[in-house]
């Protein structure tokens, strides 16, 4: 799993919570199934490792978070080039990086956007559409900021809570809960336990708000149909093309600069 976000938006905290919750689900599976290793010790059914990446400037700068959840221990702890899931919390990510880099065939991209269907597909740049089609990547949109705005009036908390929507989105698009026969109640209990541990000192209202954002993220993630690569090109956050003043006025390239 790879996160793409911005410093100050809480993605690192979300990534840590995600790893801790999966660890708690592993404990739940042991308590339920009593699986032991060859030495009779509790067996790790889901191995988790994770690490963040961000610059010294941190706030406002692009950040990444990498996490592995696997049935066998993977003895590396580094930036991941090959991933199955990308949680793209940064709606501008396609303007400064390639969130699809290293995605596996049939992987899942969850992207911050309030749009769905054809409208969302037309927001993706042409080069990204080609990679999505070539690799048969499933694309989901999630209105994380809208969900966070509805949960709190505080602007700083809206930014930091957005990542919780993507935590819910991850479990919604991942087959993990179904594969391990984890019920919705067991899942919510594991998340609530982690949120109490992480945010409990801030009060019950903060825990409940984060639970609300996570739950709506789980429910509101939407898969978009992959359209044609030739669909209208309407990427967001890209201004109109500008031309030099001389060209706009019909002057020769050498005119208008350094004359007189």
Task: Give the ranges of each region predicted by the language model.
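Active-site cofactor/cluster-binding pocket
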Residues: 1-259
């Amino acid at each position: 799993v790879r996160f793409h976000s911005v410093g100050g938006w809480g993605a690192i905290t979300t990534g840590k919570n995600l790893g801790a919750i999966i660890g708690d689900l592993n404990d739940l599976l042991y308590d339920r199934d009593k699986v032991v290793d060859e030495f009779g010790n509790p067996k790790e059914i889901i191995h988790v490792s994770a690490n963040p990446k961000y610059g010294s400037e941190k706030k406002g700068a692009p950040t990444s978070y990498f996490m592995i959840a696997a049935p066998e221990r993977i003895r590396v702890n580094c930036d991941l080039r090959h991933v199955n899931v990308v949680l793209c919390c940064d709606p501008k990510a396609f303007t400064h990086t390639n969130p699809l880099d290293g995605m596996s065939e049939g992987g899942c991209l969850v992207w911050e956007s309030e749009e769905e269907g054809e409208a969302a597909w037309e927001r993706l740049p042409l080069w990204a559409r080609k990679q999505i089609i070539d690799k048969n990547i499933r694309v989901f949109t999630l209105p994380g900021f809208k969900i966070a705005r509805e949960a709190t009036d505080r602007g700083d908390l809206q930014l930091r809570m957005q990542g919780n929507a993507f935590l819910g989105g991850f479990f919604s698009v991942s087959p993990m809960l179904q594969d391990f026969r984890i019920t919705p109640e067991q899942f919510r209990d594991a998340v609530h336990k982690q949120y109490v541990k992480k945010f409990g000192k801030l009060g019950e209202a903060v825990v409940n708000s984060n639970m609300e954002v996570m739950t709506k993220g789980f429910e509101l993630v939407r898969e978009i149909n992959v359209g044609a690569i030739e669909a209208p090109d309407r990427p967001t956050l890209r201004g109109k093309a500008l031309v030099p003043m001389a060209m706009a006025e019909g002057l020769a390239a050498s005119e208008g600069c350094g004359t007189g």
